[in-house]
Amino acid sequence: TLMRSSAASDVYKRQLEELINQQIDGGTDAIVIAGTTGESATLTMEEHRDVIKAAIEFTKHRVPVVAGTGSNCTRTAIQLSQEAEEAGADGLLIVTPYYNKATQAGLISHYSQIADSTKCPIIMYNVPGRTGCNLLPETVAELVRTKSNLVGLKEATGNLAQASKPMALTDGKLDLYSGEDGLVVPLMSIGAVGVISVWSNVAPGKVHAMCESFFKGDIKTARKLQLEALPLVDALFSEVNPIPVKKALNLMGMEVGPLRSPLCEMSEANAKKLAEVMKNYGILA
């Protein structure tokens, strides 16, 4: 999310359309708005709604828009999801509840209530390193079996064995997305259909080319693109996301603004390393 300052109620849209156009021109197949990289946790409800509406407006139906509408409060997630659907979102990305550490029964209840509240297709998002909550494969399978609009899973455990199990348990009814930029090709090898990416913010063409190559059967090229990107991916996660990627975009002249507290600016040493890696990767002069 682009911000003029770190103060509340200071989200701006001047560069959002440019950023969206850059992604689409680079081959990105869908726009995900108000997710982790979009600093959704520090947006007010009004800002959250506004940035989703703006993304839908600027995308102009060229690609689908997936709105991040997760919350650790089921009622809030339902409200955000219904508002995003009304605004024209094509799908929803809903992270597991964070901090309150729901049980698997609680997760089934949470996602079931949200699924019942909207007709939008929903991608569940499992990132236990951030949430303190792990959406287990058996739980995913139960949700997919009982709710027809729970269609996808963004898997960010970094655990290939866990990522494989929902695919085995859902008989082709689940679209798996990598939530780890360093593991896209490995996850596609077990059936993932793509990635919801931080890396693509700075190199959409490379990410698209990697996925396209894999799906066309050119595994050698896909593997090459994945391995070439590993130093950049490491740099983009050298501090908590989205600190490095906002720094990277600002270095590239995108003027996406500062971070909102409690996130803070990248350390000088890590910023220097990031710039060096970006130059080596060919995305910074």
What role is predicted for each listed range?
Residues 52-60, 82-85, 115, 144-145, ...:
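Surface-exposed amphipathic alpha-helices with a cationic face
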Residues 182-285:
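Structured C-terminal cap/extension of enzyme domains
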